[in-house]
């Protein structure tokens, strides 16, 4: 959402979900000579522009005391990044689930660092402001439906695994790893001041390292749910 807002796209944050800390990571090959995040200097790192992994990589570089000029970012979507990773034409890959578990199981990838090093990681649900303004009750029902689905997953683990496997085409063992990482429960809620502040800090970091061209105010795009009668 940060990149879209910085590009003046119309959007509204309608909800958020806590992301499991180990659901995204920076991967290296099993035979990699990279031992620490400081060793990323000069390395080719694949990441999808504007994704949560883009955010993760920005935080990793900051933690390592490196800049974007210190690395060679390779902008690739997950499928292309996986192919490059398998051919070892990249040195590291910033990625999220289920691609993370698939690479760990099939390519024996190693985790250099994951989200456990960075608290306050969230996944967001975004809506069209015009639709939300016209149909606020429908937006609230959408969030309610997601939470009903979350409760169903909790109570029907075998069926949830079957549905997830069939809908994604993942191997059952990989799908199970992804589900096992999932927070239980994993409620979707409207944004709290703490979540807005955390997202604002990321936006400020992105501006500081010139990943976005200007300052943005996250709060200005946050949807407020209608009050219950």
What is the predicted role of each segment?
Residues 9, 66, 170, 211-212:
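Helix N-cap/coil-helix junction residues
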Residues 134-211:
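Secondary-structure end/capping motifs
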